[in-house]
């Protein structure tokens, strides 16, 4: 008897073999995996009539084409969600549900918010794997890292490429060894701008990040300042050594924390952009402030700007539950301290800053404390699955 996964795979393959659909999909880039047949199956299987599509900025140019194809082959109506989507934390199931959508399809990010936690609306994540020619990267690694042990990381789009890279080099005749670390609940090799694995510096010679831009790369650099970092940009096909001013960042953040120690009135910003503002984390911070006898108010904001915060002159220090990198990267642009939850815990003497790195564990299952999203204290309790019992009778 075929498993459910096998049955689904068969149905998706039948949809994918539709010659008309194949022709329609030619307008999309062939090396981008938008999983349109799987999405069509999902819409049909859930009998969804009104489907929300959410894209990051780099993929929204394909939104209209994908929407047209989905409507053509399922008869559903689609709505393209136009609010800015910075990352996996911005999945906006609340808005999609409030609009009466049956299904939300989120493109370009991993399942940071599990589908079982999007109550009241069906959910589909499409990672949009991007297939690239790895021959040049393989040559670069051979040329520059003979006899070295490397860690390779990336965003979710290039995770399959990391697996190919590891298989290529982890052979008996290769002097190069490649590891793919994992920071659960992320996929092996995946890094976010706020979450990355903490590595044993004695075991590795370098980190190689596959991808463009520096936001995700800087996360693992901040978390592992002792290890040299390199970036391979698959679009420019360049391998570069990358640097980060750890001393300046540390000076700025500790300076803000020291000012916060003396503050009496705090503003807690609960981010409302998608799922950024975790209510349990906000409540944990409120409890910490209450124990220290501090005054506070809660403010809901989708995006955080100095001009907006200046409208609250009575607040001495701000703490935002949205994105740690907003404080780390842009905190000096705000006239008053703008901390994120870990830094408030430091300011209130609930934890000390590690001497050799700055934590990037905001969504890690193994985070330092209950001021992070997936700390054990904040994880949704999953119901245990009931055992599936099959009773067979012996043929006489």
From Swiss-Prot:
Its cofactor is [4Fe-4S] cluster. One of its GO terms (cellular component) is 2-(3-amino-3-carboxypropyl)histidine synthase complex. GO terms for molecular function: 2-(3-amino-3-carboxypropyl)histidine synthase activity; 4 iron, 4 sulfur cluster binding; metal ion binding. Pathway: Protein modification; peptidyl-diphthamide biosynthesis. GO terms for biological process: protein histidyl modification to diphthamide. Its EC number is 2.5.1.108. Transmembrane segments: none annotated. Keywords: Iron, Iron-sulfur, Metal-binding, S-adenosyl-L-methionine, Transferase. Residues 372-396 are annotated as: Disordered. It is an enzyme of class 2 (transferase). It catalyses: L-histidyl-[translation elongation factor 2] + S-adenosyl-L-methionine = 2-[(3S)-amino-3-carboxypropyl]-L-histidyl-[translation elongation factor 2] + S-methyl-5'-thioadenosine + H(+). [4Fe-4S] cluster binds at residues 89, 194, 323. InterPro entries: DPH1/DPH2, DPH1/DPH2_1, DPH1/DPH2_2, DPH1/DPH2_3, DPH1/DPH2_euk_archaea. Binds 1 [4Fe-4S] cluster per subunit. The cluster is coordinated with 3 cysteines and an exchangeable S-adenosyl-L-methionine. Component of the 2-(3-amino-3-carboxypropyl)histidine synthase complex composed of dph-1, dph-2, dph-3 and a NADH-dependent reductase. Belongs to the DPH1/DPH2 family. DPH1 subfamily. NCBIfam families: diphth2_R. This is 2-(3-amino-3-carboxypropyl)histidine synthase subunit 1. The lineage of its organism: Eukaryota, Metazoa, Ecdysozoa, Nematoda, Chromadorea. The gene is dph-1.
């Amino acid at each position: 008897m075929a498993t459910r996964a096998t049955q689904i795979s068969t149905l998706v393959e039948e949809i994918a073999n539709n010659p008309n659909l194949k022709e329609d999909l030619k307008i999309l880039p062939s090396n981008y995996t938008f999983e349109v047949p799987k999405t069509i199956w999902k819409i049909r299987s859930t009998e969804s009539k009104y489907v929300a599509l959410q894209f990051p900025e780099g993929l929204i140019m394909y939104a209209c084409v994908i929407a047209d194809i989905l409507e053509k082959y399922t008869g559903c109506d689609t709505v393209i969600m136009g609010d800015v989507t910075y990352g996996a934390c911005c999945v906006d199931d609340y808005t999609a549900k409030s609009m009466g959508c049956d299904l939300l399809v989120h493109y370009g990010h991993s399942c940071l918010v599990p589908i079982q936690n999007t109550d009241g609306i069906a959910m589909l994540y499409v990672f949009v794997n991007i297939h690239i020619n790895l021959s040049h990267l393989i040559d670069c690694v051979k040329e520059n890292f003979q006899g070295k042990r490397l860690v390779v990381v990336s965003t979710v789009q290039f995770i399959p490429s990391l697996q190919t890279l590891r298989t290529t080099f982890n052979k008996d005749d290769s002097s190069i060894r490649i590891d793919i670390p994992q920071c659960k609940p992320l996929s092996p090799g995946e890094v976010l701008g706020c979450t990355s694995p903490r590595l044993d510096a004695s075991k590795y010679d370098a980190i190689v990040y596959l991808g463009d831009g520096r936001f995700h790369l800087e996360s693992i650099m901040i978390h592992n300042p002792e290890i040299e970092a390199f970036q391979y940009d698959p679009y420019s096909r360049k391998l570069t050594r990358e640097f980060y001013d750890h001393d300046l960042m540390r000076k700025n953040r500790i300076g803000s924390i020291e000012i916060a120690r003396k503050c009496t009135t705090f503003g807690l910003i609960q981010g409302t952009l998608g799922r950024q503002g975790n209510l349990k984390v906000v409540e944990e911070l409120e409890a910490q402030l209450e124990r220290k006898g501090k005054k506070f108010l809660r403010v809901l904001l989708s995006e955080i700007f100095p001009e907006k915060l200046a409208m609250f002159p009575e607040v001495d220090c701000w703490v935002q539950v949205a994105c740690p990198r907003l404080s780390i990267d842009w905190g000096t642009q705000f006239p008053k301290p703008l901390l994120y939850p870990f830094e408030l815990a430091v300011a209130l003497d609930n934890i000390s800053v590690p001497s050799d790195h700055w934590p990037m564990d905001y969504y890690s299952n193994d985070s330092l404390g209950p001021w992070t999203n997936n700390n054990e204290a904040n994880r949704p309790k999953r119901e245990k699955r009931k055992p599936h019992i099959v009773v067979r009778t012996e043929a006489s």
